[in-house]
Amino acid sequence: MTRQPHKQRNRQERAALHEKQKQVRAPLSPELREEYGQRNVRVNAGDTVEVQRGDFAGESGEVVTVDLRAAEIHVEDVTQETADGEEVPRPLEASNVQVTELDLEDEVREARLESEEDNE
């Protein structure tokens, strides 16, 4: 394992997609943290998040897309205007948001969260 910063950055940037999933994790709200017994969770499309940092701090919305290649998420109503006046989604780092509501339509995800809760 290298300690050189440029190699660390390259390794993160060039990671395989199944490893990049670790880069799109966000902290849970205190209520969800108490309920599920874990501190953070991978962000999925459909989750409701609150932006904690940056120009949009305090905004809440549903996650529209998760871009694993860029390790970014796009949140509903968090947009920026282009030079020609078009509204485009503003990419956010997952670490700068807090998950306030989980989308539990995926049975596997729900089972995983429940098993984590049981382990504590």
Curated annotation (Swiss-Prot):
- Gene from which this protein is expressed: rpl24
SUPFAM superfamilies (UniProt xref): Translation proteins SH3-like domain (SSF50104)
NCBIfam families per the record? rplX_A_E
Q: Where is the composition biased (Basic and acidic residues)?
A: 10-22
Describe the family membership recorded for this protein in Swiss-Prot or TrEMBL.
Answer: Belongs to the universal ribosomal protein uL24 family.
Could you tell me what this protein does?
One of two assembly initiator proteins, it binds directly to the 5'-end of the 23S rRNA, where it nucleates assembly of the 50S subunit.
Oligomeric and partner information: Part of the 50S ribosomal subunit.
Q: Does the keyword RNA-binding apply?
A: yes
Task: Tell me the PANTHER family matching this sequence.
Answer: 60S RIBOSOMAL PROTEIN L26 FAMILY MEMBER
Instruction: Identify this protein by name.
Output: Large ribosomal subunit protein uL24
Return the annotated region ranges for Disordered: 1-33
HAMAP family tied to this protein: Ribosomal_uL24_A
Keywords for this protein: Ribonucleoprotein, Ribosomal protein, RNA-binding, rRNA-binding
A GO BP entry is: translation
Cross-referenced Pfam families = KOW (PF00467), Ribosomal_L26 (PF16906)
Q: Name one GO molecular function term.
A: structural constituent of ribosome
User: Per the record, what is one GO cellular component?
Assistant: large ribosomal subunit
Say yes or no: keyword Plastid present: no
CDD domains attached to this UniProt entry: KOW_RPL26
Please report the organism this UniProt entry assigns to the protein: Natronomonas pharaonis (strain ATCC 35678 / DSM 2160 / CIP 103997 / JCM 8858 / NBRC 14720 / NCIMB 2260 / Gabara) (Halobacterium pharaonis)
